[in-house]
A protein has these predicted regions:
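Conserved beta-strand in the GNAT
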Residues: 58-66, 73-78
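A short beta-loop-alpha structural element at the N-terminal edge
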Residues: 1-17
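Conserved acetyl-CoA-binding loop-helix of GNAT-fold acetyltransferases
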Residues: 79, 85-98, 125
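Conserved GNAT acetyl-CoA-binding A-motif
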Residues: 100-112
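Active-site rim helix/loop that mediates acceptor-substrate recognition in acyltransferases
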Residues: 18, 22, 27-54
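Conserved acetyl-CoA binding element of GNAT-fold acetyltransferases
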Residues: 70-81, 111, 135-138
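Conserved beta-strand-loop-alpha-helix junction that forms the acyl-donor binding cleft
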Residues: 110-119, 138-142
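Conserved acetyl-CoA-binding loop of GNAT-fold acetyltransferases
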Residues: 124-133
Length: 143
């Protein structure tokens, strides 16, 4: 299948990206991953997130990326299972890291489910390292 190049993640991509995320094992969505909240995230972090489409406009890969001014974060990197192994995930990560570097962000983190062995292999191949000295703590502000 012919693939277009990496393009900016726009509001029109939200619903297709959510469908992609739901169909990819290892990607977890929460209440904070609604279309309005992703739209707000994209507006707050323009140019950091990206997608890949086919020439027909079918979304086959996506990543959400943003920063807080000090640290960057990649969320929900997903490539359609039929399109894996073609460098799409690597290209999306490269796009986001380039945008973060340009913004002067020196460090980037991801959250990866501990049972996502395929994801762990992917990130290790790209040179990412597990921080065994940290754990993620979360507090829910929603009722």
């Amino acid at each position: 299948m012919a693939i277009r190049s990496v393009i900016a993640f726009e509001a029109r991509h939200i619903e297709p990206a959510l469908a992609l995320y739901r169909g990819c094992p290892g990607v977890g969505l929460s209440a904070g991953d609604s279309a309005p909240e992703i739209a707000a995230f994209l507006a707050r972090n323009p140019g950091f997130s990206a997608v890949v489409e086919t020439p027909a406009g079918d979304l086959v890969a996506a990543v959400l990326c943003g920063h807080d001014g000090r640290r960057g974060f990649l969320y929900h990197l997903a490539v359609h299972p039929d399109e894996r192994g073609r460098g799409l995930g690597r290209a999306l990560v490269a796009h986001s890291l380039s945008a973060l570097r340009f913004a002067g962000i020196p460090r980037v983190s991801i959250h990866l489910f501990t049972n996502n062995a395929e994801g762990a292999k992917f990130w290790a191949k790209l040179g990412w390292r597990l921080r065994a000295d940290l754990s993620v703590q979360q507090f829910e502000l929603r009722d």
